[in-house]
Each structure stands twice: as structure tokens, then as C-alpha cells.
From Swiss-Prot:
Assembly and interaction partners: Homotetramer.
Protein name per UniProt: Glyceraldehyde-3-phosphate dehydrogenase
Record keywords: Cytoplasm, Glycolysis, NAD, Oxidoreductase
Top EC class for this record: oxidoreductase
The UniProt record lists the keyword NAD: yes
Phylogenetic classification of the source organism: Eukaryota, Fungi, Dikarya, Ascomycota, Pezizomycotina
Swiss-Prot/TrEMBL catalytic activity: D-glyceraldehyde 3-phosphate + phosphate + NAD(+) = (2R)-3-phospho-glyceroyl phosphate + NADH + H(+)
Superkingdom of source: Eukaryota
Residues given in the record as NAD(+) binding sites: R13, I14, D35, R80, N316
Record: active site: C152
MF annotations from Gene Ontology: glyceraldehyde-3-phosphate dehydrogenase (NAD+) (phosphorylating) activity; NAD binding; NADP binding
Any Gene Ontology CC annotation: cytosol
CDD domains associated with the record: GAPDH_I_C, GAPDH_I_N
Length: 338
């Protein structure tokens, strides 16, 4: 069966990691990339060398109009506006919108003018339906033209929250993500008018920040709407983050019973999405881990049988990008494109 033809708009951090994940997949093929700020030679360099994930495992060459990656042609465009990108030239039907700019349905829909069939926003969206693999992906309907893969933190929290709510019913909860720094932060102190603390140097500080990830869980699990909220602590690590979910549960359960429920789910309906470990891991051990959520059984604690703190890790770059590929593969199957 022919692979699903994919285009990527925005060859930044997530765009490149999505490309790397696609290169490992037999179901999808990236046939076109658009980025107005870089040329093919520089794109090839950034794809080949990565300070966090190492060198690209494959062959990359540049040609006049793009790249040749593992003997496959990848057309490169430099258009600023989505409606100007001629996706139809390469047959790209599913577009990963990873600029971080066109995150509303109206803005992302502009890709359809160039021949795209569907758009997957690799960020939370104010109005596009959000899907988290393993949680609510089956609610996708083929009439949707623009969807969101939610955020990396929502992809970690939602599977864990789903298991706890399904088995024990969450009354309310608070989440903190201890999150590696990202491209929006500063290498040295600089101006950040809307978030003064966010303008401080990323490599020297623990920076309290806001996140909509916990509230977004209520959009993918309606039963939890209004029951979760959270915050972020941006920390001086380059990759891998960890979620701390502290919640009250209706059905009394010991910590061992909670661990057992998560372990069962990780080996069954959430296999490949949720992982369970009792190893003495630290963040760098999980660079390149494909799971959306890695439950750390030894890191959690409970105060009593109705109040518990749960800890789950995630590679906020790699695992999230892998879910983008998984989501494309799933919706293409529903659309009849594979």
C-alpha cells in the first residue's frame, strides 16, 4: 500500500522531529516542506545534526528544489502564506502545521487552497478539535478538515488521567509540569512584555509559567472538564519533561492498587501510548522514548486512599512528534487514504 503523502509547514523544532519520525515510518512519507526562513542546504544541515537527538539515521542530500532523503525527493518551498504553498504539486494531502503561527481553524484552513486535504496543527488550538491518541482519537469524523494534536503535556497527562478517572473517578486535581526549556525562551535575559519571568535566561533559572495543558484534558475527556488545572515550571534541561498530577479520587484505592491499574492499561488498551516503569530513571534516560506518558511508579506517593500524587515522564519533542505521525496514519485510514 502506498504511503500517506505528508507536507510540513515550518521546519523548526517540532517540524524537524516530525520529519525524523516520518522517516522511520512505512505508513507516511514527507514529500514537501515549507519554510520561508531557510534554504534547502540549511534545512539539510539542521535535519542531519541535532544537539539532543543526535545525527539523522539515513542519507540526506540537497538538490536544486529541495532534499533527497533516503532516496526520496522532498520538495522545498519558501512561501510565507499557507494559501501560496502548492501542496498539490507533490501530492501532499496531510499537512503538519508546525509554525506555531497558524493555529486556528481559519488560518490553518488556508492550506486547503494549495491542494491539501487535511491539516494537523502540532500545537493546541483555540477552536480546532483536539485529539490525543489513545484517549479520544476514535471520535474523529471524516468531515473535519483541520484538527489539533493538542500539546505535548496534554498528550502525557490525558492517558494517565483517563486511567485514573475510569478506574477511580477523579473529583479534582492539580497538575504541575516540570518542563524543559523551549525555543520561545531566552538564552540571556531579554524583553518579554506579556510574561516578565519568561524573559529570564532559560539555562540559569527555574521559571514558573502558565499552561493550558490540564484544562485541555477536559476537552478530550469531557467528564474531566472543570476538574483539572495546572501550571508549569520551566527548568534548565534541553529535553524531557515530567508531569506531577495530584488529585482526589472518589473510589478509595491504595497506591499499589493505582499502580496496578496503570500497569494493566499500559499493557493493553494504551499500549504504545502509556508506559509503566519501576526503574530508577532520570530525565535523560527517556530521550527518544516513543511513549506519550511514562508512569514512574517509584516517584508517586499517596497521603491516604483518596488523595494521591502521580508522576509521569515524557519526551516533549520526540514522543509528541511520534503522535503527530500516528494521528495522521489513523485519520488517513478513516478517510480511506490508505
Amino acid at each position: 500500500m502506498a504511503p500517506i503523502k505528508v507536507g510540513i509547514n515550518g521546519f523548526g523544532r517540532i517540524g524537524r522531529i516530525v520529519f525524523r519520525n516520518a522517516a522511520q515510518s512505512c505508513e507516511v512519507e514527507v514529500v514537501a516542506v515549507n519554510d520561508p526562513f531557510i534554504e534547502p542546504e540549511y534545512a539539510a544541515y539542521m535535519l542531519k545534526y541535532d544537539s539532543t537527538h543526535g545525527q539523522f539515521n539515513g542519507d540526506i542530500q540537497t538538490v536544486e528544489d529541495g532534499l533527497v532523503v533516503n532516496s526520496r525527493n522532498v520538495k522545498f518551498y519558501n512561501k510565507r502564506n499557507p494559501e501560496e504553498i502548492p501542496w498539490a504539486e507533490t501530492g501532499a494531502e496531510y499537512i503538519v502545521e508546525s509554525t506555531g503561527v497558524f493555529t486556528t481553524t481559519e488560518k490553518a484552513k488556508a492550506h486547503l487552497k494549495g491542494g491539501a486535504k487535511k491539516v494537523i496543527i502540532s500545537a493546541p488550538s483555540a477552536d480546532a478539535p483536539m485529539f490525543v491518541m489513545g484517549v479520544n482519537h476514535k471520535s474523529y469524523t471524516t468531515d473535519l478538515e483541520v484538527i489539533s494534536n493538542a500539546s505535548c503535556t496534554t498528550n502525557c497527562l490525558a492517558p494517565l488521567a483517563k486511567v485514573i478517572n475510569d478506574e477511580f473517578t477523579i473529583i479534582e486535581g492539580l497538575m504541575t509540569t516540570i518542563h524543559s526549556y523551549t525555543a520561545t525562551q531566552k538564552t540571556v535575559d531579554g524583553p518579554s512584555a506579556k510574561d516578565w519571568r519568561g524573559g529570564r535566561t532559560a539555562a540559569q533559572n527555574i521559571i514558573p509559567s502558565s499552561t493550558g495543558a490540564a484544562k485541555a484534558v477536559g476537552k478530550v475527556i469531557p467528564a474531566l472538564n472543570g476538574k483539572l488545572t495546572g501550571m508549569a515550571m520551566r527548568v534548565p534541561t534541553a529535553n524531557v519533561s515530567v508531569v506531577d498530577l495530584t488529585c482526589r479520587i472518589e473510589k478509595s484505592a491504595t497506591y499499589d492498587e493505582i499502580k496496578k491499574a496503570i500497569k494493566i492499561a499500559a499493557g493493553n488498551e494504551l499500549q504504545g501510548i502509556l508506559s509503566y516503569t519501576e526503574d530508577e530513571i532520570v530525565s535523560t534516560d527517556l530521550i527518544g522514548n516513543n511513549h506519550s506518558s511514562i508512569f514512574d511508579a517509584k516517584a508517586g506517593i499517596s497521603l491516604n486512599d483518596n488523595f494521591v500524587k502521580l508522576v509521569a515522564w515524557y519526551d516533549n519533542e520526540w514522543a509528541y512528534s511520534r503522535r503527530v505521525i500516528d494521528l495522521i496514519s489513523y485519520i488517513a485510514g478513516k478517510d480511506g487514504s490508505k
